[in-house]
């Protein structure tokens, strides 16, 4: 029996030395140590031995078993290390090859234009004020001299959350909140997103950016309004730009006007963008209506003011010659990389 165990041990050693893969090692393990393995069969047959032989043979059998198990374990480790070395050799990185360049993002034209507009007004002494995008009807309409059932409400398709809450249709509510919380003199701008229930096309979007401005103090006149906006236009579009004011109507200003600027595409010569007129509508403006001042507890007999409002998206389109507002919101890198 001892001789048989030595033969099994030597046979296993020779086979292990010749093995080249984990699969071959597994075959050897099953052959000698599996449930029907050669060594396992000998251990099961020890019951037929005499009491004197049993402990001697059992000791030798266990030693052979331990030796084969340890040898298989070492062989597994050696093969694993060889495979790792081969894999690392095949995966060697050539550090002399050029690396993959990281894409550098660019600022959105809306952001660039907003920053330019804010910088111009800040240099003129304006402060920046903010307000909620979900707004009370009171601030979005009533305090702006647009009571319930006023025809001006029909001009703006509004997203109503309930009877008293809306998604703001303009940043004018920030002007009301500022006049309620600050005493004149007031000189502020209110940039931000606004919402209107418009169908999406080349010139309309349900979400867009607006910037409104307000000045309230003693002795403010329409001349102050014109001077401020003409200076803004020259700083924004260059000294050659010309402006003109046309009478208009807004419920929150009186008198009201719209300011046009010479077309930035044809420089006032006439083209399809300006429809041959040489002029492009730039903004709405006017003197703050006395009732709006009263709604904010400001005495219109003592104070006067002017207000104005831009569509920032429109400014971007005019400044960069963009003919479709949807391009500003589609995240198309081919478009955005131009700026």
UniProtKB/Swiss-Prot annotation:
Entry binding sites for Mg(2+): 254
Cofactor: Mg(2+)
Gene3D superfamilies linked: Bira Bifunctional Protein, Domain 2
GO cellular-component term (any): cytoplasm
Claim: Heme is one of the keywords in the record: no
Keyword Glycoprotein in record: no
Record-linked PROSITE patterns: AA_TRNA_LIGASE_II
Subcellular localization(s) per the UniProt record: Cytoplasm
Catalytic activity: tRNA(Phe) + L-phenylalanine + ATP = L-phenylalanyl-tRNA(Phe) + AMP + diphosphate + H(+)
Biological processes, Gene Ontology terms: phenylalanyl-tRNA aminoacylation
A Gene Ontology molecular function term of the record: ATP binding
Highest taxon in the source lineage: Bacteria
Pfam families assigned to the protein according to its UniProt record, in alphabetical order: Phe_tRNA-synt_N, tRNA-synt_2d
Cofactor mode of binding and number, as noted: Binds 2 magnesium ions per tetramer.
This protein's UniProt keywords: Aminoacyl-tRNA synthetase, ATP-binding, Cytoplasm, Ligase, Magnesium, Metal-binding, Nucleotide-binding, Protein biosynthesis
Its EC number(s): 6.1.1.20
Residues of the signal peptide: none
Chief location category: cytoplasm
Family per similarity comment: Belongs to the class-II aminoacyl-tRNA synthetase family. Phe-tRNA synthetase alpha subunit type 1 subfamily.
PANTHER family: PHENYLALANINE--TRNA LIGASE, MITOCHONDRIAL (PTHR11538:SF41), PHENYLALANYL-TRNA SYNTHETASE (PTHR11538)
Subunit organization: Tetramer of two alpha and two beta subunits.
Protein name (record): Phenylalanine--tRNA ligase alpha subunit
Origin species: Clostridium botulinum (strain 657 / Type Ba4)
């Amino acid at each position: 029996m001892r001789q048989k165990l030595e033969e099994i041990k030597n046979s296993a050693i020779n086979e292990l030395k010749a093995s080249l893969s984990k699969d071959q090692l597994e075959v050897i393990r099953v052959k000698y140590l599996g449930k029907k393995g050669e060594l396992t069969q000998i251990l099961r047959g020890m019951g037929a031995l005499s009491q004197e032989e049993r402990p001697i043979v059992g000791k030798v059998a266990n030693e052979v078993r331990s030796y084969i198990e340890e040898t298989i374990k070492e062989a597994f480790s050696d093969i694993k290390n060889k495979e790792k070395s081969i894999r690392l050799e095949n995966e060697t990185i050539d550090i002399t090859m050029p690396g993959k360049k990281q894409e550098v993002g660019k600022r959105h034209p809306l952001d660039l234009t907003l920053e330019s507009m804010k910088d111009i007004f800040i240099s003129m002494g304006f402060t920046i004020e903010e307000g909620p995008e979900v707004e009370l009807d009171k601030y979005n309409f009533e305090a702006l001299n647009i009571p319930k059932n006023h025809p001006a409400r029909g001009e703006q398709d509004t997203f109503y959350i309930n009877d008293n809450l809306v998604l703001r249709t303009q940043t004018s509510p920030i002007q009301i909140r500022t006049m309620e919380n600050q005493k004149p003199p007031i000189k502020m701008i209110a940039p931000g997103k606004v919402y209107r229930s418009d169908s999406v096309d080349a010139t309309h979007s349900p979400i867009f950016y607006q910037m409104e401005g307000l000045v309230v103090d003693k002795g403010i006149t329409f001349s102050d309004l014109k001077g401020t906006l003409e200076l803004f236009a020259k700083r924004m579009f260059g000294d050659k730009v010309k402006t003109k004011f046309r009478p208009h109507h807004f419920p929150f200003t009186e008198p009201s006007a719209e300011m046009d600027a010479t077309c930035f595409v044809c420089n006032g010569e006439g083209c399809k963008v300006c429809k041959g007129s040489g002029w492009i509508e730039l903004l709405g403006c006017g003197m703050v209506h006395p009732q709006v001042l009263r709604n904010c507890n400001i005495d219109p007999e003592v104070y006067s003011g002017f207000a104005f409002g831009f569509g920032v998206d429109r400014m971007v389109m005019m400044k960069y010659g963009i003919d479709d507002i949807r391009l500003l919101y589609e995240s198309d890198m081919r478009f955005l990389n131009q700026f």
